[in-house]
Each structure stands twice: as C-alpha cells, then as structure tokens.
UniProtKB/Swiss-Prot annotation:
One Pfam entry name: ATP-sulfurylase
Protein location: Cytoplasm
Name used for this protein in its record: Sulfate adenylyltransferase
SUPFAM superfamilies: Nucleotidylyl transferase, P-loop containing nucleoside triphosphate hydrolases, PUA domain-like
Catalyzed chemical reaction(s): sulfate + ATP + H(+) = adenosine 5'-phosphosulfate + diphosphate
Task of the protein: Catalyzes the first intracellular reaction of sulfate assimilation, forming adenosine-5'-phosphosulfate (APS) from inorganic sulfate and ATP. Plays an important role in sulfate activation as a component of the biosynthesis pathway of sulfur-containing amino acids.
Region feature (N-terminal): 1-169
Family that this chain belongs to: In the N-terminal section; belongs to the sulfate adenylyltransferase family.
Protein species of origin: Aspergillus niger
Positions marked as site (Transition state stabilizer): H203, H206
Keyword Cytoplasm applies: yes
Residues annotated to bind 3'-phosphoadenylyl sulfate: D434, T435, V436, R437, R451, I477, A478, R516
Allosteric regulation domain as annotated region, ranges: 395-574
Lineage: Eukaryota, Fungi, Dikarya, Ascomycota, Pezizomycotina
Length: 574
C-alpha cells in the first residue's frame, strides 16, 4: 500500500474537476487570462495533479507568511517552500483583478487554458522576507537572484479549478502523476519504496547507494529525476533521461522504476529537502534519500557554500514525525579497486586504496575526450553522455570582436574566417556589424537601448549557431559593458563557448586611417551619437584577448586568436 498523501488526501484537482470540464472550459474562454511563465507552469502542474498536496492553489498571504516564518501552512501542515503566482501592478490593473475575481491561467507554449484561479487575495511580494527566511539571504543565491531580477512585485493567492492537463511531447509514458504512480506501485505489489531525487546523470556509485538503501529496508527503488527547471549549466534532461534508461537494466530485475518529475527547483538546500520529501510522499514513496548538500546551489563567488553539508538532512530530520516519510541519509560511496567494489566512505578501513572522480573531473574528461573508466560509470551511460557532450574539438564557439569603428576588427574577422575555413572541422559564420544592422536590425537606431537590442540579437544568433557546433565570428562595435556581459551570458546560457576579443586600437589611429571620412562627419556634428566622439566606448574589463592593429598586423592577431583556441582544445590534437 502506497504512503498516505501529505495532509491525508491527495489533492488531484484534475480528477476532481473532470466532471465539470466542459463548463470550466467555456468559462475560461471569457475570463481575463494570465499567461504563465515556465516556472509557474511547473508549479501549476504539480498543484493540479496533487504533487504539492495539500495545496489546492497558489498561496495566499497567510500561507505565504506561515511557510516563510514557520515552515507551516495556515492550517498547520508542514510545508517549506512558498508556491506563489507573481504578477505586475500593470497586469493586475489591466485585467482589473481583485479579491473574488476569477482568472484563467494559460500556457505560453500553446495558448491553451489550463486552469481557473479564484482570487483570495493580492499582496505585495515580501522578497526580503522570502530571501532571508527561505533561502538564507545571500544575494548570490540563484533563487534570490530570481526573486530580485525576475519575480514581479505582487503575489496572487487563490484556489485552482483544473481545466486541462499540460501537454508534453517528451517521455510522456514516464511522466507519472502521483495517482498514476500509486496505481503502478499497487500493480507491482510494492509497499515499501525508496525515492531517489537527482538532477544529474547517474553512475555506478548512485546505483550502488540506491540498491544498498533498498536492501537495508527490504524496499524497491523509485528513480525520480527532475525534468523541469534545474540549475543553469546542468546536463539537459533529454540526455539525462536516456542515461537513466540505459542504467535501469543494471538493477536487479523488478527492483527499480523510473518516473520523471516536472519540478521547478529552487536550489533551496534544507527547505528544498523538506519540500522534496513531501512531493515524494505524495507520489507514494515511503522512504526518501537525502544526500550531502541536498539541492544546494554550490558555492558563491567567494568560494563559500550556501549551506552546510548536512543542513538538509538535519532539516528533514526535524520534521520527520509530521512528514510521514522515512529519511534515508545519503552515505557517500567510494570505489575500492583492490576488491572491485563500492562501499560507504565511513566503512572503508584506514589505509585501503580508494578511487573517485568528481563532477568537475568528469566534465573535464567529457570536454577533452579523456578515458572514463568502467569502475566509475557504465559504458552505455558514458556513450550517451559523450554523444550530447562532444569534446571541445567538436564544439562550436563564438569569437566576439569589440572596438571602435575602423579599429581593424572587420579585417581581423574576415581573415579569421578564412583561416578557420582552411582549418576545417566546423562551419564558420561571420556577423559583421554593418551586415547585422542591414539584415537583422534595420529598424533600430543608435540610442543606448537600440544598441543593446542589436547586440542581444547578435548574441542570440551566435548562441544558436555555437550550440549547433559552428564557429561564429561577430564584430560589432558593442560599446557598452552591460551589453557585452549579456552577450557572453546568452551564448554561454545556450551551451556555447564565448571569447571576447578587445580590438584596442587607439581612437586617434582609427580616425587617422578612416578613408571614408565618417569620423570627420561626426566631429562636424553631421552624425550624432557616434562612438568615441559624442558617445562613450566602455573598455572591456574581462576581455579574453586584447589586440591593437596600430601595433600588430592582422596576420599576427589572427594567429594569437588561433593559439588561444588551440590552447583551449578547440582543434584536434594527435
């Protein structure tokens, strides 16, 4: 028999409201509508299917305050993470929202109506309270950054009536709702289930620790990875799910099942661990593995951990009696080469040789194509990871040249394009400033805002091409540090590699060699907002390479760029 849901009853709103579907669908068409963000969609799905039981909607102020201050809903149930629906004052005013209003919640991906929210209250988001009490207060924490940079100024609280399920087109058979997973466990005859949460690929050590946990408790294993929103830079869920599927046959037959969880993680450490335990309880698990630094975001810019290594375990232990799910404390396992086995580190006798490969080392080996031993991971898993994470010699990159007009960046870009084409191995795309202005940004002017927009368009194109394995050479003026930083983040965020080259040719040289007389026109006032004349150029603070055409030949500069790429592994090494 599966575990009792949190709060006693599974709040499966989809099943509850199915008899009224036609009525609710018709009403949703005529109500004011709010189009949800990706994170809001993840939250809504788990509200509607009961994954967030006992919630029946987005939190009102009483629930929000109780969760932030005491880890409890207003009804007294333990709940550790604020589940809120944020909206701007502009949206609230335009839709004429107030307490008692009914609001359609819409999917941004396909414009489908998913639910109707009856508004209980609209309250100002106390971001400072949420940041401090829920996430610890460090402004570098990703959840706090999201609060400060993305979340709107008001929260809308109220209960949900479900209209339609979210559409998914990937791994549909593995996306069990809590009710479906409970039925599946019952069909298999499972009464004791250890749930394992992960946002990373699984290797031999993970298989070993989950089997050990199941063996000690005479239980089965639910591999329950997150496929919603995880930490930026994580391996994509498509790759991870293929790797989980490849790993599954390595378990004893009938021991483990794989189910996917469309959760938007907050990387909230102790608070998140409690939340994860509640979610797994709602999915029918009786036991939940909580690891070292569970759901922690890593380190801040000072190299400090956001949470203590065992804070998450202590937090779940504090509420274990009320949570109603047994916590299995993750004991890190290590490989013993002399006996070809894995053991928990605290069970290894002194002096016995052990081997480990860190996540950083694994990423390095994937990047360079170095050997990944079978004692660490299974060949079928490594094969999948290599397919999605090719070595650098097969990856794309963006060379972003910035400098004054006539600094020589266009000449460098063209020469570099020829050199890379001769090198072969990847397609090469050239994005010169004038070309982009003509083809992509013809409607933009030269205000600071328009210049920023132009650079972001270049970054978007560069990121998509780089992710597909191409070499991109961009050569805009890009005078503002803010725009260049955003461009780097955009390319890196899409999985690409970005190199900023500052063509630091002095302004005097650029003017002196200007055969088109454009600087002269700007000096006479015939051209306004001209970089270097009446608009500033902010020199890069973090260029990967700085060159100067007044002191170096184009050929030598291109050679410097090639050497930089070679040193980073972007060309085949014999």
């Amino acid at each position: 028999m599966a575990n009792t849901p949190h709060g006693g009853v599974l709040k499966d709103l989809l099943a509850r409201d199915a008899p009224r579907h036609d009525q609710l669908a018709a009403e949703a068409e005529i109500l004011p509508a709010l189009t949800l963000t990706e994170r809001q969609l993840c939250d809504l799905e788990l509200i509607m299917n009961g994954g967030f039981s006992p919630l029946e909607g987005f939190m009102n102020q009483k629930d929000f305050d109780g969760v932030c201050e005491n880890c409890r809903l207003a009804d007294g149930n333990v709940f550790s993470m604020p589940i809120t629906l944020d909206a701007s004052q502009k949206t609230i005013s335009e839709l004429k929202l107030q307490a008692g209003s009914r609001l359609t919640l819409r999917d941004f991906r396909d414009d489908r109506n998913l639910a109707i929210l009856t508004i209980d209250d609209i309250y100002r988001a106390d971001k400072q309270k949420e940041a401090k009490l829920v996430f610890g207060g460090d402004p570098e924490h990703p959840a706090i950054k999201y609060l400060n940079n993305t979340v709107q100024e008001f929260y809308i609280g109220g209960k949900i009536e479900a209209v339609n399920k979210l559409n998914h087109y990937d791994y549909v058979a593995l996306r069990y709702t809590p009710a479906e997973l409970r039925v599946h466990f019952d069909k298999l005859g499972w009464s004791r289930v250890v749930a394992f949460q992960t946002r990373n690929p699984m290797h031999r050590a993970h298989r070993e620790l989950t089997v050990r946990a199941a063996r000690a408790r005479q239980a089965n294993v639910l591999i329950h990875p997150v496929v919603g929103l995880t930490k930026p830079g994580d391996i994509d869920h498509f790759t991870r799910v293929r790797a989980y599927q490849a790993l599954l046959p390595r378990y004893p037959n009938g021991m483990a099942v794989l189910g996917l969880l469309g959760l938007a993680m907050r990387m909230g450490g102790p608070r998140e661990a409690i939340w994860h335990a509640i979610i797994r309880k709602n999915h029918g698990a009786t036991h939940f593995i909580v690891g070292r630094d569970h759901a922690g975001p890593g380190k801040n810019s000072k190299g400090e951990e956001f949470y203590g290594p065992y804070d998450a375990q202590h937090a779940v232990e504090k509420y274990k009696d009320e949570l109603g799910i047994e916590v299995v404390e993750f004991q890190q396992v290590t490989y013993l080469p002399d006996t070809d086995e894995y053991r928990p580190k605290d069970e290894v006798p002194a002096g016995v040789k052990t081997l480990d490969i860190s996540g950083t080392e694994l990423r390095k080996r994937l990047r360079t194509g170095a050997h990944i031993p079978e004692w660490f991971s299974y060949p079928e898993v490594v094969k999948i990871l290599r397919e999605s994470n090719p070595p650098r010699a097969s990856q794309g990159f963006t060379i972003f040249l910035t400098g004054y007009m006539n600094s020589g960046k266009d000449a460098i870009a063209r020469a570099l394009q020829v050199t890379l084409n001769q090198q072969g191995g990847r397609s090469v795309t050239l994005l010169l400033g004038d070309t982009v202005r003509h083809e992509l940004s013809s409607e933009l002017g030269f205000s600071r805002e328009d210049r920023h927009t132009n650079i972001q368009r270049i970054a978007f194109v560069a990121g998509e091409l780089t992710r597909a394995g191409a070499a991109v050479i961009a050569a805009p003026i890009a005078p503002y540090e803010e725009s260049r930083k955003a461009a780097r983040e955009a390319v890196a965020g899409s999985g690409g590699n970005f190199f900023l080259v500052h063509v630091a040719t002095p302004l005097e040289h650029c003017e002196k060699t200007d055969k088109r007389g454009i600087y002269a026109k700007a000096r006479r006032g015939e051209i306004k907002g001209f970089t270097g004349v009446d608009d500033p150029y902010e020199a890069p603070a973090n260029a990967d390479l700085t060159v100067d055409v007044s002191k170096q030949s184009v050929r030598s500069i291109v050679h410097e760029i090639i050497l930089m790429l070679e040193s980073e592994g972007y060309f085949e090494r014999l």
